[in-house]
Amino acid sequence: MTDESKPTDDQPTSKGRQGARWGQERRLEFIDYRLRWDGQINRSSLTDFFGISVPQASLDITEYAKLAESNLEYDTRARVYRATESFKAVFPSSAVERYLDDLLRVAVQPEIPYGSFLGWQSPVAAVPKLGRRLNADIVGVILRAIRETGFIEVFYQSLTDPEGGERMLSPHALVHDGNRWHVRAYCHKRKAFRDFSLTRIKCCKYVGQDRDRADEDYAWNTMVNVVLTPHPGLTPAQRKLIENDFLMEGGEMHVECRRALLLYLLFQLNLNEDQADQRPEVIQLALKNRDEIKDLIQY
């Protein structure tokens, strides 16, 4: 088995329905997750998912009961353990954010194996995203350069240069702007750190060792405090609703963002200057310290 094909916690082996050779702590997380989101669990849930024996499943449930005795009770008629009214999740993996993320990943990309703990699944739909095809070999070379502090030679296309050309890059991080993936790299042609869309890199070759340049990327290492408030054009009741949505304190929300990613954040929040003429109900938020950070935005 190659390194690339070795199973991880999120992509188990095929011994069980979802895998085996999982430590007991992982199985306890599974019990906690299923009780929280399915409201019940039995031994077959564990044996089917992990490929373990029935006696081992019984031991795992007993061990979980030691951790949180008040979280479950046995239904003798249905022969299942049910979550109690006083259930309190033991593990962070049972958080609502994790559960909804699991649902979304399965709904959006059902063809991709994903070792979630999902059992019963609510019907779910997601707004379609436009597909951007990524080249796994190119990503692999980029990751090698990041891992080994090397530099790469790429053929890169952009809207300003749609025909494309060769670039020498020293990458140090990957970036997701909420819509697509980029690599953050020092461009030896432009003598500056920039973001390069992974889908616009048409070929990529590892050249050799470079020095670690991450500390030289000032915009990457500079954190900016973004202060958000409800849009002033909203009614008082609407502003209160927005405050509750975003857990604001004193009518404000503070977000720490890398300077290099500031433009992406503002675009996501409809706070880019090009979006300023939209209705308050659409924008919903306002940038309180715009004057303070406007010169920090990198276009």
From Swiss-Prot:
Keywords linked to the UniProt accession: Antiviral defense, DNA-binding, Repressor, Transcription, Transcription regulation
Listed PROSITE patterns: WYL
Induction: Represses its own transcription.
Any one GO BP annotation for this protein: defense response to virus
Occurrences of domain WYL (ranges): 131-211
Organism: Pseudomonas aeruginosa
Assembly and binders: Homodimer.
The name this protein goes by in its record: DNA-binding transcriptional repressor CapW
Protein purpose: Transcriptional regulator of a CBASS antivirus system. CBASS (cyclic oligonucleotide-based antiphage signaling system) provides immunity against bacteriophage. The CD-NTase protein synthesizes cyclic nucleotides in response to infection; these serve as specific second messenger signals. The signals activate a diverse range of effectors, leading to bacterial cell death and thus abortive phage infection. A type III CBASS system, part of a Cap17-CapW-CdnC-Cap7-Cap6-Cap18 locus.
Stretches the record annotates as Disordered: 1-22
Segments for region (Probable ligand-binding region): 156-200
Notes concerning its domains: Has an N-terminal winged HTH domain, a central WYL domain and a C-terminal WCX domain; the WYL domain of each subunit reaches into the other subunit to form swapped domains. Crystallization in a pH 5.0 buffer alters the relative positions of the domains, suggesting a mechanism for DNA release.
GO molecular function terms noted in the UniProt entry: DNA binding
Any Pfam family hit: WYL
Region (WCX domain): 208-299
InterPro entries, A to Z: CapW-like, CBASS_pafABC_assoc_protein, WYL_dom
Region annotation WYL domain: where it falls in the sequence: 96-207
